[in-house]
Structures are given as structure tokens and as C-alpha cells.
Amino acid sequence: MTKPVPYNATWEALVPTPTIEFWFDFASNYSYLSVMRIEAAATRLDVRIGWKPFLLGPIFQSFGWSNSPFMLQKAKGDYMWQDIARECQKIGVPWTRPSTFPSGSVLPLRVALVGADQPWIGAFCQRIMLRNFAQDRDINTPEAVSEELTALGLPAKAILTEAQSDANKQRLREQTHAAQIRGIFGAPTFFVGDAMFWGNDRLDDALACAAALQSNPHPLHTG
């Protein structure tokens, strides 16, 4: 006979919080949309975010592309700018078409890698994205990144020193290689376990998938 075991608080400690991996590049305009809404959406569903900054450039180069496909294909690029403006209006985030696209993003990505498990990661990513896609300001200089870290009350000099260390530079290279191994071909990309979801328009599907994997906190006992 199958019967429920009486609730015990220890079950909650044994049930892992569902996780969504969020692979992004600050140069990616569609990653901007996801960065600006993922934390609130994940919180509503009690889903943890695994922040995975990586470089899109080497991914594109592996396909023989010298630039973003949006820049290599004029019709696609023209459509993309219209689509981004509509999507920003829909979710209520500011938008200014950047004068340089795609922008350099290595330095803020290195900082994001340092902060990936820190409570400030979401706020930092939002500030960098807003700087790029709402304010049309450079994001890839120590001065720019320091300004955003300082605005968050963080020790900018110490964080930048760690971000620029040889060890952290290698970590970003390894993370970008890991993206290639996982089959990532663009950003944003989300993983729930081995299930991949590509594009900002699949964020909600990825979050729903993660939430559905939440284990039953009142497991059945067979006996």
C-alpha cells in the first residue's frame, strides 16, 4: 500500500531549488531583454538562476562568421532593430539603438564571471545592459565598469583586479569553450538540465520547465 509520509521540515532541505542556466553576452541585444526580466520572473516561480557569461564572438567565428549575423544579413538586421524596439516597449524597458553594434564586452563579462554567484550579479548585469542599450555608452573600459560597480556600492578596484587576473581570463575562455561544447550558437540561451532553450522568447518556457521539475516536498513512502 502506498501512503504519504507525515510532513517533516527536513524534506525541504532535501529538495533542490530548480535551476535555469542563463548564458548571455552583454553585446547581445536579445540578452538585454532577458537580463532585464529574468530575476523577477524566476523569483515568481521559485527558480534559481545560474548566471553564465560567455563570449559570442568565438562562437560566431567557429561558424565562419566575421560579425553578428544581424550585421551580415541586412534584411535580418533591419527586422531585428524593429523587433527589439517593439519588445522593449512591450516589457517596459528603455531602448536606444547603440551607435556601435555589437559592442566590445570582454571586461564586463569578466566581472560578471567574478560575480556570478554573488548577490549583486543581477543588478550589475542590468546596469551594464542599460548602459549599452538604453544610454548608448561604452561598457568595455575600466572606467565604465568601475562606474557601475561603484554605483552599486561595491569595491570596484578589487573586483576589477580579480576580473583582470590571468586565472579569471582563462575562466572566461573556458566558459566560452563550454558554451561551444554544449551546442550554444547564440544568446541568450537557457538550459534546464540538458534541455536547451534559445532566445529571449523562450525564457518563459525555460522557466516553466525548471519550475515543473520541482520535486514533491511530501514524497510518498511505499510499504
Where do the model's predicted regions map?
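Structural alpha/beta surface segment adjacent to cysteine/selenocysteine redox centers
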Residues: 32-132, 209, 220
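C-terminal cap of thioredoxin/glutaredoxin-like
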Residues: 7, 11-21, 25-47, 127-223
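Extreme N-terminal basic, low-complexity initiation segments
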Residues: 2-5
